[in-house]
Amino acid sequence: MARVTVEDCLDNVDNRFELVMLATKRARQLATGGKEPKVAWENDKPTVVALREIASGLVDYDVIAQDEIVDDEPLFTQYEEEPNEAI
């Protein structure tokens, strides 16, 4: 697909607002290197790749939601109080 149009993407997404939100989340995943693209990069920017994936029907909200679920360790460990010693 040489050029991506909004109409191509709207075949797979309900409206333009959902398209913007979906493309934003997917482009961020691609830009941070957290996820691999489902189409060839072809020297495009992450935003264009995200739109091409949506237009191809390879990415939808279900895919994005699954990718957002992360089972990492918590950012903060449980606080353990240390005794204060008076000087």
UniProtKB/Swiss-Prot annotation:
Pfam families: RNA_pol_Rpb6 (PF01192). One of its GO terms (biological process) is DNA-templated transcription. Promotes RNA polymerase assembly. Latches the N- and C-terminal regions of the beta' subunit thereby facilitating its interaction with the beta and alpha subunits. Belongs to the RNA polymerase subunit omega family. The RNAP catalytic core consists of 2 alpha, 1 beta, 1 beta' and 1 omega subunit. When a sigma factor is associated with the core the holoenzyme is formed, which can initiate transcription. NCBIfam families: rpoZ (TIGR00690). This is DNA-directed RNA polymerase subunit omega. Its EC number is 2.7.7.6.
